[in-house]
Amino acid sequence: MKLVLAEKPSVAQSLAKVLGANKRCDGYLEGNGYVVSWCVGHLVELSQPEAYNETYAKWRLEDLPILPTAWMYQVSASTKKQFGILKDLMKREDVKSLVCATDAGREGELIFRLVYHQADCRKPFERLWISSMEDQAIRDGFAHLEPSTQYDALYEAALCRERADWIVGMNATRLFSCLYHQTLNVGRVMTPTLAMVVMRDAEIAAFVPKPFYTVQLGMDGITAASRRFDDKEDAQEVLAKCKESMKAMVKSMDRKEKTEHAPLLYDLTSLQRDANRILGFTAQQTLNYTQALYEKKLVTYPRTDSRYLTEDMKPMLPSLITQVAEKIGADAADWKADNGTELSVDGMCDSRKVSDHHAIIPTGTMCAADLAALPSGEKAILQLIAVRLLCAAAPNHRYAEDMIVLVCGGEEFTKKVRTVLYSGWKNIWQHFYPSKEKEQKPCGGPILYPNAMVSFSQAEIKEGKTTAPKHFTDVIHFESRQWKYSKCKGAG
């Protein structure tokens, strides 16, 4: 008999269904040589300081820092019953081994191991490591269970995170609470995050908007602008000179053909960023919706930092892409490449760039599911993931950018004109998420070439104001954190 421990009851039920453990018992399911149970999140947690020494029950500066040499754990008061069930199952004589089937990640590993050690279990266990809750993925996972020792380092990393949180939180909270005579919660992640928000708000509060001025020349389909002037009189002087002739000379025209590569597939952070920007969801909402979709077998594992798929997935992708496109109502003219060019999956598959889990994509189960029955938030996230899969397989977007430089009254005026050469993946994206900004099309204005003289019909001054930094939203906060991390990493 094997005891399988999942992280949540819903996951345990999915595993039990595939394994044939259909007999329902109090806190577990059993059958076909398996006992399947669940942990209900963190059943075991680090003990409070007073468990190490009664004197720590009172917060005093002289006791700091509190640095345990042997870490103590306790069973969470709200989950004692389920822990007791798991402990009894582990002690059953007919249970010869265990399967760690908690979420395939650092925290999932920690949840299982803490229960295992707190129950003083010595029986061998293996690891189920899957990226999809589809039935076939579960079968394949159980057919290829991995040695527990392969994930010892992952468990130790989770211990480091947990204990670092405890050391910083317990000591710093007591320190500042004693110093300021009020409870001030301090956390390893929470406090630096709060500091970033405070610093940004201070920047905004101290910001003083400053006016600036540009001179703009208008002609058939083109508006060219001067540099910014801080002094309005300088702009007025240039405007007066331009109005004397109402003509400008074309100094230069520089055309560059540019490419916007097809976007990578989503990892959790990039999905949260787009969901915030496009749908207005917070990071936590996006995670909750995606986790729910994962447990319903509609998308792959969400807590991933990889944006690629493994090479062995390549053969199944063309069929999946076609089914996904049909399921979400993508017209062939939108999701297939221009001029009948076939989609390519080569760019999204690179096993070297996949860490614990591959990128987030829809599953084959999604293609047969009743999506209309999904809650609106889950449905919106599922569409975002599905559309990104189609875009990632589509050709690059290509466009030409013309930089026009005019001279009038001794001042240069510039205008960028962008012309789409090949819509590529943007054809798909804009079908579902139309851009609020109108794409610039080739203008029907004057024929321009270097040294040509062109007449303009309008000359005016436009006034603007510098703007303060934006308040943090989830998406801006993500970018700020990644920038700070990259900066520190680059500093060596």
Label each residue range with its predicted role.
Residues 11, 107-111, 156, 160, ...:
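Hydrophobic (often cysteine-bearing) scaffold residues that line and stabilize catalytic clefts
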Residues 157-187:
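Amphipathic alpha-helical segments of the small helical/lid subdomains adjacent to P-loop NTPase cores
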Residues 19, 23, 93, 118-123, ...:
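A generic secondary-structure signal for well-formed alpha-helical elements
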Residues 9-10, 39-41, 103-109, 130-133, ...:
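An acidic- and aromatic-residue-enriched active-site/binding cleft used to recognize and process polar
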Residues 281-352:
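Extended, well-ordered alpha-helical scaffold/bundle regions in very large, multi-domain proteins
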Residues 1-162, 166, 441-445, 457-460:
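Intrinsically disordered, low-complexity regulatory segments
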Residues 35, 43-76, 88, 181-291, ...:
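Long, highly charged, low-complexity internal segments
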Residues 341-373:
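Acidic, turn-prone loop/beta-hairpin segments
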